[in-house]
Amino acid sequence: MVQKSNYLLLLLIFVSACANKTFDNTEEITEYIKEEENNYCYKKNIEGIEYILQYKPTDLLVEQELNDKTDQKKIEQLRDKYKKYMYFNLSMSLNNQELLSNVARDKSKFGQMVNDLAFGMEEKVNLFTPKNDTLAMADFIYPRMYGMTNNTSIMIVYPRDKNYLKEDYIYFTVEDLGFYTGEVKFKIKTLEIVNEPQLRFN
């Protein structure tokens, strides 16, 4: 009887761990994914550069495009549209400034970095499995802020390939952008992506 009770308890814990957490608003879900212990946000400091890699759940993109939160059909349409991809925000800062501000006096470095950030991130960033199977980047968005923010922020988009998410984790790497950091590697747990948090729209 005790053994059966223990089994049921373990089963309940497992099911709870695999369930999608649901939040009432964007503030709650944003705070949740910011906490490193929840495995959606990863931070590293290399050679003074603060790297923050954060997964962006599907429903945050749905919410940005949704006008009527009671329109269930529209909600499902937008979820179908966005859940085909995985979205990562990569933030980098040095001396509490965006990266370009730190090379503004060197025209050669400045020009190369502008080119890398605006056009070359598919060559600078990689996502791959422990078996070194690399997933091709679908898109990236770099909004140049002209020194108006204290970090360089890029949204990087990958196809949501189920074969890659069968692994326990995947690697996300950023090549050296000219600050002698070497390759910066993040180990991302896939279970949290599969069971990403959701918003309660109505």
Name each model-derived stretch.
Residues 1-28:
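Bacterial Sec-dependent N-terminal signal peptides
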Residues 18-202:
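Conserved functional micro-motifs across diverse proteins
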